[in-house]
Amino acid sequence: MRFLIDECLTVQLVAVAGHAGYEAYHVAHVGKAGWKDWHVMQHAREQDFVLVTNNDVDFRQLYAAQPLHAGLVILIPNVDGEKQQRLFAGALQQLAHHGEPVNQVLEVDLDGENATFYFYDLSLPG
């Protein structure tokens, strides 16, 4: 799996993915900072990236209209970089067991200090 980290999240998530054996890039480091959400999604789809974001409303809506996508990881809470890293590391463990999230979303949330993980399908009906 390859990951594209949205600019709303810390660049340190690239290192978290790398440490777990995955390829990852941050939007700001690939010349895409400031791009509109639909353009980020298009780039992720064209390059077969799983997009990692905490912009759940916009990207969930954009991805739901796509017939095929590599997947979406949403870190729901708006937390500091250290907690983002912890949540993303947990998401990577979940994905290692689950497999590639083609046409799926993995939502990661916090219940107190405990992370919760929820997979669901998200693609154009058809």
Predicted regions and their residues:
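Short beta->alpha connector loops at strand-helix junctions that form conserved
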Residues: 28, 55, 75-77
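Short, basic, glycine/proline-bearing loop/turn elements
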Residues: 20-29
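Bulky hydrophobic/aromatic packing residues
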Residues: 13, 26-27, 41
